[in-house]
Structure formats: C-alpha cells, structure tokens
C-alpha cells in the first residue's frame, strides 16, 4: 500500500485546494471523502498539523481527519541523513546570505548619503524587505514544519505531496518521491477500486 506524507500547502494554497472544493469546508470534506476510499496511507507531522489548524482554525478538523491522516512526527534521533545534503544546504545558505547582503547594499546606495532618494523611505524599506525575503527564503527549507514533512517522507519511504518548490528541491536531493499537490485528487481517484473489481475508479 502506498504511503503519502501531506504538506499544508494542499489545504492552504488556493490554486491547489480548489481541486477538492470552493471553500474550506468543501475542501476538507472532499479530500476526506476520497482519501477514506483510497488504498493508501496518509501521514502529516504534528508540527505541520498544528500549523494547519492555526491557519484554518479548528472548526474544519474532527476525529475523521485524524483517523484518515495519521498524525506522526519523524523519528529524528534515528534518521541518517546523507552528508552531501547537509553540505549542499550549507552552500545554499551561504550563497543566499551573500545575495541578501548585496541587496541590502543596493538599497543603502539608493537611499543616498543624505537620504535624498526620490523613492519614499517607507517604500524603499518595503522593497528591501520583499527582495531580501525572496532571496533568503524562496526555494529553501525555512521552517521546522517543512523539515518535519521531508524527514517523515524520508523515514517512511513515502511520497511527498506538496506545492512548495523549496520542499520539492530538497526532497529530490534526498531521493524522496514527489507528487505535485495539484495532481492529488486525480491520484486519489486512481487509488480507489470499486468493490469486486481490480480497476480504479474513472
């Protein structure tokens, strides 16, 4: 039986969640309806589950969700991570820090020695924040929740389901199978077999 580790982006990214419904209630009920019939096991780390409940509120969660989606943290102390992944991560962080410094220097020059830039100061600060955030966070693991999701998929030899490009990138480095979250509904349908047949639901 196939195993899937779910990232919060399935339910929080509107471009992804709309495959299951038009609002939060129909999204969760639509997912659970298919997942409960699929011949598969579903997992989500506790940290990611807490984050999801914080974002969406507790109203959409019930015993049904926790019955279908196993809430379980990775066994961090037992996992052996390839050293090459750690070296790649350090190199990536170093490059991003250098890039962030260049962005900061660029905006300092725009401000000028006397703050005489034609760009209003608050706009300049906002632009600096946005570019700095993009340089340091986009396409990288930037939270404990992201790391927990990847480590759990690695430990269980499961399929990682996410829309996050940074998670996809680092999961690929670790040899984790990846499913684009936008394809999850179709995948679940293929894993549902009608009673008495061996064929998936069309």
Swiss-Prot record:
Phylogenetic placement of the source organism: Bacteria, Pseudomonadati, Verrucomicrobiota, Methylacidiphilae, Methylacidiphilales
Protein name (Swiss-Prot/TrEMBL): RNA-free ribonuclease P
NCBIfam families tied to this protein: PRK04358.1-5 (NF003344), RNA_lig_partner (TIGR03875)
Function, as annotated: RNA-free RNase P that catalyzes the removal of the 5'-leader sequence from pre-tRNA to produce the mature 5'-terminus.
Family: Belongs to the HARP family.
CDD domains: PIN_VapC-like
UniProt cross-references to HAMAP family, sorted A to Z: RNA_free_RNase_P (MF_01078)
UniProt keyword annotations, A-Z: Endonuclease, Hydrolase, Nuclease, tRNA processing
Molecular function, one GO term: ribonuclease P activity
